[in-house]
Structure formats: structure tokens, C-alpha cells
Amino acid sequence: MLKTIMKTLSGMMVLLLMVGCNQGVDKIVIASKPMTEQFILAEILTQLIEDRTDLVVEQKLGIGGGTSNIHPAMINGEIDVYPEYTGTGWLFVLQQDPISDMNELYEKVSIAYLEEFNIVWSSMYGFNNTYGLAISKDVAEAYDIKTYSDLATVSSELVFAANPDFYEREDGYNALVEMYNFTFKDTKEIDIGLRYEALSSDDVDIITVFTTDARINEENVVIIEDDRTYFNAYHGATLIRKEVLDENPGLFDVLELLANQISNEEMIAMNYEVEIENKDPKVVASEFLREKGLIE
């Protein structure tokens, strides 16, 4: 009789464990790189997931080293979700040659990540945070500069500035100059946080920017067109371990609610609210999600 009871209890325990597994994990870990945009995106993901699922989110925000430390942690299962950029995945992680077509890039990086790392890319958010070149409004009007090709015709009269890393990157200064035949009057190294001040003070004429920078819409800043598409696309999207998706049916559909929902203008505005107006990323994320009707 005792043996029968013990067998019954053992069977019930196994059944309970199986049911628990089928219900999925209770917690997922969301990470971000140490930059304003990533803090906002991580908050958007956190609030969306907690509103639309029964999952509890643990945040690991501002991880030093960014992709170089987050990616191995995802492979090891220490991190489940984080926002990434197509160009970073393709060029930095996979070490592949640049692809100018954004859709081809997305397709190839998605396939490679799934095959090599068992990591899934969501659809792209919509915005493209790539490199760009900015000049002052006065310079743009004085020289009639609208494109990089326009800039090339007068580059010998202008001073170019970028952060030190840009001069060292394979896809940075030297290759850019070669493609467009720039012959700048002078070049300067400048801290990434001082670029816009340098442009405003007329210390330099051209600066490198990221195309979702908080200050990119300032009145005196003009972004010129990369008319030969030198810079690779860096479209934002969510990365998630496939194991987590397998354990939580429906989670991918929740992440897909952000597909094509964040334009460059919207990302710039959110970055501006946090960096310049000092708003809490949690508040900015919540306002965005409510405006889009994605949470109540």
C-alpha cells in the first residue's frame, strides 16, 4: 500500500513539473548598452512585456562594453533580450563585409544569428541609427551643400572633426575619404560629447553624428545626404534567445508589436527628452507606448 502511495505521489510530482515547464519561465532578463537610446528601448521592452504577458523582467542596464559583453552573456543564457542594431550584428559580431541594402542586411544577419547562436531577431523598429555627417546651417547655405558629393567639391576649404575611434575604424575616415574624394583643409579629433559645441562655435565645419542623436534637430545643424550610401545601415531590433521563445509561446508576437513603430524622428525626440530635458527613461517609454496604443 505504501509503495502504491509513493508511486502515485511521484507521478503527481512529475506531472506538476511538466505543467510548470509548459507554462514557460517566470522571469526574463533584459539588458542594454550604456547609452540613452538603449535605456529607453530597454524600458519600452520591459513595460510592453510586463503589460502583455505574465513574465517578470529583470533589468541589467548600461552594461559596459556593450555588444562585446552582452552577446557572450546571451549565448551563455545570462541575458535573454536586448535591443541591437543590424550593422553592429553584421559587421562587429559576425565580422562580415558591409551590405548597403537594409533589407538584405536584415535577412542575412537574422539567418546567421539563428544558425550560429540560436538567437532570433525581431522585425526592425523602423529607425536607422547610423553614422552621418553634419554641418552648420551657415556653411550649408554658403557653399550650397546638400550631399556628400556637394561637400567633396568644397572640402579643401573646410575642417573635419570626429572622435578618435572614427579615424581608426575600417569603415571610418580613410574609406569615406576614398569613396568621396574628400580633401579637407584640416582634421581634428574631438570627444564625442563635444561635437555639437564645436560645430556651434565654428571651431570645425563638419562633424560625425549618429542619425538619432538628441541634438540632431537643433536649428543650426544640417544633416547632409550620404548620396552614395557609404555608411552601413544600423536599424534597431530586439534580440531574444530562441530557447526563451520556445518556452513562452506568444512572446514573439508581443515583441513584433514594435515592428515599424519607431521612426527616426520619434527616436530623436525620445533621446532629446531624456538627454536634454532630463526626463526619466521609464516615463518617456510609458508615454510612447500609450501614444501608440500598445499598453493601457
Describe the predicted segments one by one.
Residues 48, 68-79, 174-179, 192-207:
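Short helices/loops that flank or line small-molecule/ion binding pockets
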Residues 36-56, 79, 174:
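Short, polar/charged alpha-helical segment
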Residues 17-20:
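C-terminal motif of bacterial Sec signal peptides marking the signal peptidase cleavage site
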Residues 51-62, 157-159, 177-190:
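A local structural motif
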Residues 24-38, 55-62, 156-162:
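Short, well-ordered beta-strand elements
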Residues 93-122, 203, 215-229:
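Ligand-binding "clamshell"
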